[in-house]
């Protein structure tokens, strides 16, 4: 089963949940998760928790334990917060390049599903009649301890946007589209290195070419160790074809390490 994860402590999450139930024919069944009703349509279920999702390590196991459902992928419907309060629709995989300040474990990465996140970007960009930014975010926050692929899809970046009905509709429609299509999509898969948190060059590449990114390690996470880059490749559900480097947006030692790893593994090295 494909899982859409929502939480009562997040206005954007509840907005998206409401639009999914209203617009896509989800029906309440007899199951409960964390004491909350489960909604199902075909092979997709909507689950709701009462806590912040970024701290929910082992969520996939909790789902199976409480409901008997074995998730194949988890889409976290969430808010995005930023000091700039930039109106945005974003997607990313979770994990920590360094210390676990906001959930997960230190230097631990969740399993990325690049095709799902690329489809999310493309669909949100297509539906975006709000004039908001649509972009990847770099890999950050938890949960990192999940045994199935997952991604966050977010409405940002202040309460005004979190409760925006149209934003909720866009993200709800995008989630359904992604879950219906990601398994049948073939893209060139890359691990991204460099740039800022909102990964502008990686976002542009994903929107304009066949590249699909999994983990993205921004410049603020550099210097990046070889071990973590190898972990990012390993923690990708699809075969990785390339290592992509935002050249000016990366530190020198990380650039050279990435090039060496690409050569060692026989991957394409893309310098942008």
Curated annotation (Swiss-Prot):
Coiled coil: none annotated. Keywords: Hydrolase, Metal-binding, Zinc. InterPro entries: Deacylase_DtdA_archaea, DtdA. GO terms for molecular function: D-aminoacyl-tRNA deacylase activity; zinc ion binding. One of its GO terms (biological process) is D-amino acid catabolic process. Signal peptide: none annotated. Transmembrane segments: none annotated. Binds 2 Zn(2+) ions per subunit. The keyword Metal-binding applies. It catalyses: a D-aminoacyl-tRNA + H2O = a tRNA + a D-alpha-amino acid + H(+); glycyl-tRNA(Ala) + H2O = tRNA(Ala) + glycine + H(+). Its cofactor is Zn(2+). Its EC number is 3.1.1.96. D-aminoacyl-tRNA deacylase with broad substrate specificity. By recycling D-aminoacyl-tRNA to D-amino acids and free tRNA molecules, this enzyme counteracts the toxicity associated with the formation of D-aminoacyl-tRNA entities in vivo. Belongs to the DtdA deacylase family. PANTHER family: D-AMINOACYL-TRNA DEACYLASE. Monomer. This is D-aminoacyl-tRNA deacylase. It comes from Thermococcus kodakarensis (strain ATCC BAA-918 / JCM 12380 / KOD1) (Pyrococcus kodakaraensis (strain KOD1)).
